[in-house]
């Protein structure tokens, strides 16, 4: 992403190595790292950044509401991007560590459902929603701080908690996340390291508006007020 977060959830450089904010809080200027490229070899520059952010708002993709105050994103030069806002937004830097800050290759032609073109240390070699995703070290990765530590990473999707813990105990997997508190207690502290942290999951209670009674707005309001 254009920006990143550290383990304390504080905003850090990402594709942008630094940035400036105008006194009125309505102009953000981002200075990009040099010599960046996508996994397909295409150069990653300010045009890609500006295009990606503008597309997010124009097409109203996921989290487009987070850049609601954006008037436009533009490439000043190959390594400089300027974001102009209609009103100041103190959350903008934080938002640019997430979906609004994702940068896509504006010139790439590929099927986004089956392929991925990114700029990180790994590329997606294969994906099966029922079993696993295989990541491969990106030979064209431009960064120095997060060089791939291993050539391949296999992420398996284990739907049964007990089976997942047994896979860890048998050595079938090296890392397990998440693991519920009850099963975590069964792991030998001398053999395994169990880490706990705040989660970012969101739980939503939504109305099924195909239900005859819930179609009535007054019923939904009454439930909400209860």
What is each of the regions a protein language model found here?
Residues 1-23, 54, 117:
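N-terminal lobe/hinge region of extracytoplasmic solute-binding protein
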Residues 10, 37-42, 110, 140-144, ...:
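Short helix-loop capping/hinge motifs at secondary-structure junctions, enriched
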Residues 10, 96-148, 152:
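Gly/Pro-rich hinge or "lid" segments in bacterial periplasmic/extracellular proteins
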Residues 17-60, 76, 82, 213-215:
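Aromatic- and charge-enriched surface segment that lines or borders ligand/interaction sites
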Residues 20, 24, 65-105, 126-128:
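Surface-exposed binding/hinge segments that line
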Residues 45-52, 78-84, 120-121, 149-152, ...:
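Alpha-helical secondary-structure segments
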Residues 110, 140-186:
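Ligand-site clamp/hinge motif
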Residues 185-196:
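Ligand-binding "clamshell"
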């Amino acid at each position: 992403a254009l920006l990143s977060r550290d383990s304390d959830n504080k905003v850090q450089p990402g594709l942008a190595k630094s940035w400036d904010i105008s006194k009125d809080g309505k102009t953000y200027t981002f200075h990009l790292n040099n010599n960046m490229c996508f996994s397909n070899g295409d150069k990653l520059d300010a045009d890609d950044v500006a295009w990606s952010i503008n597309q997010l708002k124009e097409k109203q993709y996921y989290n487009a509401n987070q850049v609601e105050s954006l008037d436009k994103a533009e490439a000043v030069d190959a390594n400089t991007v300027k974001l102009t806002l209609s009103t100041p937004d103190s959350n903008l830097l934080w938002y640019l560590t997430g979906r609004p800050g994702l940068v896509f290759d504006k010139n790439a032609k590929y099927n986004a459902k089956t392929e991925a073109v990114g700029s990180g240390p790994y590329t997606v070699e294969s994906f099966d929603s029922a079993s696993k995703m295989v990541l491969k070290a990106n030979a064209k990765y431009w960064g120095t701080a997060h060089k791939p530590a291993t050539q391949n990473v296999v992420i398996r999707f284990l739907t049964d908690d007990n089976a997942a813990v047994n896979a860890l105990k048998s050595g079938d997997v090296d890392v397990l996340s998440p693991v519920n508190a009850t099963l975590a207690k069964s792991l030998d502290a001398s053999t395994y390291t169990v880490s706990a942290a705040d989660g970012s999951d969101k739980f939503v209670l939504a109305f099924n508006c195909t239900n005859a009674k819930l179609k009535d707005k007054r019923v939904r309001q009454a439930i909400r007020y209860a």
